[in-house]
Regions:
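Accessory RNA-recognition modules of RNA-modification enzymes
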Residues: 1-172
């Protein structure tokens, strides 16, 4: 439990329904999702309520980001149609207590970017490094894009075996 120091969550304009939900016969709304890709399906995302892979405040940051975006009419990514403001969110946690959040946007909407990042910074003082990336490409890779440090430090510090490591937004 809580063994990951980096998780990448994906935004999707329609959440993936489980087999049980489909077989229930219930009519489900096309609710957006912020979670993990279904294996071998680039456009299917399982909405995550509670993730046991990473310690808090990761869950709270993810769920508050989802809530804020839905409440404020932010569009979630549609991979097939290549549209939507919200694409990905990466959360890094360190044993030192430092937290890095990187939000990847599909459009360069500075007003909405600032509103979300200001909201996260105000509500999560645990975030010591807050970045954003604008990715208008058709793929989700961001290695060739420049992360913008919006607030805080340009790295977090991880400590292992008495050694301290600087971890940046593009580290492993």
């Amino acid at each position: 439990r809580f063994y990951r120091n980096k998780l990448e969550f994906t935004f999707a304009d329609r959440r993936w329904l489980t087999r049980e939900e489909v077989e229930s016969g219930t009519d489900f709304d096309a609710a957006p999702a912020l979670g993990f890709h279904i294996p071998n399906m680039f456009d299917k995302v399982l909405d995550i309520d509670k993730c046991w892979l990473q310690p808090d405040p990761s869950n709270d940051i993810r769920t508050e980001t989802r809530r804020f975006c839905i409440e404020n009419g932010y569009t979630f990514h549609n991979a097939r149609e290549h549209r939507g403001l919200m694409r990905n969110m990466i959360v890094r946690t360190a044993s030192t207590g430092e937290v890095m959040v990187i939000v990847v946007f599909g459009e360069d909407d500075r007003e909405r970017i600032a509103a979300l990042l200001d909201h996260l910074a105000a509500n999560f003082p645990q975030i010591t490094s807050l970045f954003y990336i604008v990715n208008t490409k058709f793929n989700d890779s961001v290695g060739d894009l420049d992360p913008v440090c919006y607030k805080g430090k340009d790295h977090i510090v991880e400590e292992m075996e008495g050694l301290r490591f600087k971890v940046g937004p593009k580290s492993f």
